[in-house]
Amino acid sequence: YVFEVIQNSNFAQEVHESFMDLAVGTGILAVNEGDAVHPIQFNAIPLPHVVLDIGHDDNIDHVFRVRHARCDQLMLMYPKAQLSETLKKKCQKEPDAKIEILEVVCKDYTVKNDDGSALYAIVMESKEVIFQEQYKGVGSNPYVCFRWAKCAGEVYGRGPLVNALSAIKTTNLTIELVLENAQM
């Protein structure tokens, strides 16, 4: 059943986009609950939209993501959100107003011998937590973060693009010098 659900989801498209980011060194895939038709929704997250942090065991345990949404989308993104009266009034008055949200997923280190993560959604303007959710069990982080290669203590991976960057710069400089000499 699991493979059927994944096969009928948008996994193939989104993992392809994540693999394109993996060329730089790190790919990120968000796994979200869907609906009855699509039980699982995947979303490739571009690397510039997140900040990753490692825990004491060198695993990526913390994901910080800035999102922008219209007021009328808040309850669709976070159905169990607790909005303050000020935010409710703002959303009623200006449903198209953009809200900046910091989404934080962090590993729960308080529970021994079990994995757990917590998701927090914070409105940046007022610094209020509008949504929080606990995830329990192995693989409970809703973000799948994968790296091409890394050295000890590094958060982000080193992909083939990073390794080829010096060769690309040298090639560009060589072409530039050839073109300059051709003009003489």
Residue spans for each PLM region:
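Extended alpha-helical, oligomerization-prone segments that build pores/tubes and scaffolds
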Residues: 1-184
